[in-house]
């Protein structure tokens, strides 16, 4: 599958390449789509901020050790977070999908979130709630389940910003490693200052 060739690269490379890719979730009643505007790379056994740090396999992180293209879904502070596993089976690396520029199904997203505007999908737990994604998707294979990506119908960022990941204190050198990737100026990026907002259309080539 083409999408697996896309996913099974070096994790930081995949995290950058996913920016602008179309993401689709189809439940029983609604199709939700959008474009990825923010990702974070997690580099497995060596990465002190990663769930795969140290290589210990527990029931909660089993999906992280599966083949590239597996969905690793976990809950943090009641929010469901979605990661795409990268690399080969047994290497617990992945990309966290942090924010989405919504496209299709915005009305339903507004209902699911009780929000509208840029707050709708500008965070890793916000977009999953907007898309109505259940935790049961953990361990599923991307594009072989209700969640998929489309690398053919995508956008391309004008500028990609690299920075330290969000909420990673006290992890030594890993706290500030530039493993967070964002579309510069896109107002759906999490924690962006309003003074840095651009028209979303102006952030793509």
Swiss-Prot record:
The keyword DNA repair applies. Keywords: DNA damage, DNA repair, Hydrolase. It holds the Pfam family Pur_DNA_glyco. GO terms for biological process: base-excision repair. GO terms for molecular function: alkylbase DNA N-glycosylase activity; DNA binding. Its EC number is 3.2.2.-. It is an enzyme of class 3 (hydrolase). The keyword Repeat does not apply. Belongs to the DNA glycosylase MPG family. PANTHER family: DNA-3-METHYLADENINE GLYCOSYLASE. This is Putative 3-methyladenine DNA glycosylase. The lineage of its organism: Bacteria, Bacillati, Bacillota, Bacilli, Bacillales.
């Amino acid at each position: 599958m083409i999408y697996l060739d896309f996913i099974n690269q070096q994790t930081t490379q995949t995290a950058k390449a996913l920016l602008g890719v179309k993401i689709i979730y189809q439940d029983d009643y609604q199709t939700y789509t959008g474009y990825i505007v923010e990702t974070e790379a997690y580099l497995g056994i060596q990465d002190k901020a990663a769930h795969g740090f140290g290589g210990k396999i527990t029931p909660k992180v089993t999906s992280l050790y599966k083949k590239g293209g597996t969905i690793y879904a976990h809950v943090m502070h009641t929010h469901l977070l979605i990661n795409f596993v990268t690399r080969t089976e047994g290497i617990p690396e992945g990309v966290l999908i942090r924010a989405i520029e919504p496209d299709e199904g915005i009305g339903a997203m507004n209902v699911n979130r009780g929000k509208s505007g840029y707050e709708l999908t500008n965070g890793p737990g916000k977009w999953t709630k907007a898309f109505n994604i259940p935790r049961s998707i953990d361990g599923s294979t991307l594009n072989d389940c209700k969640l998929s990506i489309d690398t053919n119908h995508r956008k391309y960022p004008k500028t990609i910003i690299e920075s330290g990941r969000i909420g990673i204190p006290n992890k030594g050198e890993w706290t500030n490693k530039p493993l967070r990737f964002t579309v510069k100026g896109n107002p759906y990026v999490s924690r962006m200052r309003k003074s840095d907002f651009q028209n979303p259309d102006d952030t793509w080539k």
